[in-house]
Amino acid sequence: MACRRRLLPCAGLGLFGVLCWVWVSFASFPDDQLPLEVFDTVDRGAFLPQSAFREMEFASIASYKGPGNTDGRSNKQLPILLWWSAGLFPHFPGDTERIDCALSSCLVTSNRKVQLYKRTASIIFYGTDFRAYEAPLPRLPHQTWALFHEESPMNNYFLSHAPGIRLFNYTATFRRESDYPLTLQWLPSLDYLLRPVAVSLEEKNRLRREGMAPVLYMQSHCDVPSDRDRYVQELMKYIQVDSYGKCLKNKPLPEHLEDTATATGEEPGFMNFVARYKFHLAFENGLCPDYMTEKLWRPLHQGCVPVYRGSPAVADWMPNGHAAIIIDNFPSPKALADFLRHLDENDDEYTRYLEFKNLKSITNTRLLEALETREWGVNDMSKPNYLNGFECYVCDQENARLAAERAHRKDPERNPPPLPKMASNSHMGCPLPSPGYGQVQDLPADDGWLQIWPQDYWQSLDQAEGLESLIRHNESDPSLLWRHIQSITERRARGKH
């Protein structure tokens, strides 16, 4: 299934990718029309697998090529892209398709039997599912690795360490520095921000006089790396907070909203309920530059003020300089509470935080340009979803690389080899988790957060170094990872690492 829980923005778009400027076309081809000998042999440096293509369904349909795509090759001549993660293949039906992208064409498949084929040019991984001890080894010199990771850094801290991220040649992550940035994945459009406020300030003030808290906290995912509950618990000492969900719950939700409380969608009844609050505590579960989710964009959409902690660079993407309240700008929870009370009691100053609802008040050109120029769309039938967009990016990059390699082999003096491409830590690298409030050295040894997240972060570094060692030694058995980690640890203890 292409769209997982956190891949909601791509839901329903697979059939419409043909309409976008990258002109993605999905084709299936009957396998019995393609004899085995048309496929390149495998890399015999490892082993000879059975033909994966005998089990693949193909059927010829019209191709929708982009204006820059002059690729006239038949399917038997195209490079292959292998989607490695089980259950994530952004096409249907079957497990193999042809894609015709902006500049070139490829075959894409989820059938792992093609892993060692020479025509398999790149393997695409879903970051949440990537495990060092399950990596496709040996890593072949003719293949690149591509990473798709739009989810929280907490899902896989392997990717936040340099030895891990630099194993990949192409990236699509929430970081703006990645090759195919997904930074605004939870912001469907500019119109989403401009939607009129759902509940008027007059109504919010009336509810406040009746005893409703000014601040909403809605969370059922507790014990996360950002340690948000620890901060909120301290904040509650200084200002009234209505907390729903499993974490720090002090008020019950109406029964009819219980099933939608943790949804990332926008069920009208739930949205109208939370829109009554002036301020929403918007804490990401992991802290990393450019990691921003619906927790930030949803209150802006509703006309509430997000009180935000997540991306330290969030101000770079706000509509203007006063659309969100950044928690890290305050020295303490008490100082933040004092400021929120001040806004609660001063309508004119509170209203300044909603001025972005007028298009003329959106002054952030970075935000406007990013929304205007991104190649993928969210619920936009004129653009591909970001899964299909990224695979087309990889397809075009790989065809360019392969063409440059052929030219170099033909005339090395006139055609230099293509430059090696490797992801850097800026494509993902997220910091060591820190306590939501206070200093790590002040936490008791049996603190639950302390026992989980710092350890998980550093164990992920061990695995990144271990996999890098496996690849460097041309190992074919990923289960040897633990032996390599032990060897690295011993060398480090002797001061030789």
Swiss-Prot record:
The keyword Amino-acid biosynthesis does not apply. Its main location: endoplasmic reticulum. One of its GO terms (cellular component) is endoplasmic reticulum. Residues 28-497 are lumenal. It catalyses: L-threonyl-[protein] + GDP-beta-L-fucose = 3-O-(alpha-L-fucosyl)-L-threonyl-[protein] + GDP + H(+); L-seryl-[protein] + GDP-beta-L-fucose = 3-O-(alpha-L-fucosyl)-L-seryl-[protein] + GDP + H(+). GO terms for biological process: fucosylation; positive regulation of protein secretion. It is an enzyme of class 2 (transferase). It holds the Pfam family Glyco_transf_10. Residues 1-6 are cytoplasmic. Glycans are attached at residues 169, 474. One of its GO terms (molecular function) is peptide-O-fucosyltransferase activity. The keyword Glycoprotein applies. The chain crosses the membrane at residues 7-27. Residues 406-427 are annotated as: Disordered. Its EC number is 2.4.1.221. It is a single-pass type II membrane protein. Pathway: Protein modification; protein glycosylation. Disulfide bonds join 392-395. Belongs to the glycosyltransferase 10 family. PANTHER family: ALPHA- 1,3 -FUCOSYLTRANSFERASE, ALPHA-(1,3)-FUCOSYLTRANSFERASE 11. Protein O-fucosyltransferase that specifically catalyzes O-fucosylation of serine or threonine residues in EMI domains of target proteins. Attaches fucose through an O-glycosidic linkage. O-fucosylation of EMI domain-containing proteins may be required for facilitating protein folding and secretion. This is GDP-fucose protein O-fucosyltransferase 4. The gene is fut11.
